[in-house]
Amino acid sequence: MSELKELWAVKSFRARIFLAILPTSIALVVGHFATDRQRPYDFHAEESFVIPPKGREGQEMTINWRVTHHRTCPGTVERQLVDPNTGVIVAAYDPAPADTNGGQDGWLRKTFRVPRDIQAGNIAYQSKLTYQCNWLQKFVPALAIRYLTPRIVFTVEK
């Protein structure tokens, strides 16, 4: 025991202990935030739908997403209309802030306008989501949580 007290009395030993604990603690905190991948929402395509199921050019439609809400985080949503067969983007809407108030009742509802120059036929709605759920994801955008919603198909009529 006296050897330990003598060792602790040496300044260089205390400095080495401090220099070992500090970087390890920082690495643990940064590692925890870097591996934080829990999505704010899980989207259930089989229970989701578009109202009305058939629309026309210029018409407003509402997508009703059945979701499981896990957490609330700031982020952005890039909504897209795509060809359900090829995945080609037919229309892209301006990025918008992610909804931080929705999903508590199990539903997210988003209204969009069908573009005037869109072709008739089946079209799929999807969103590219980007969330920053902690400070590291805000400062290092490559670590942000990114994912696509499932595609919900509806019909555009002339």
Regions found by a protein language model. Give the residues of each.
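Contiguous segments within soluble domain cores/interaction surfaces
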Residues: P40-L108, W135
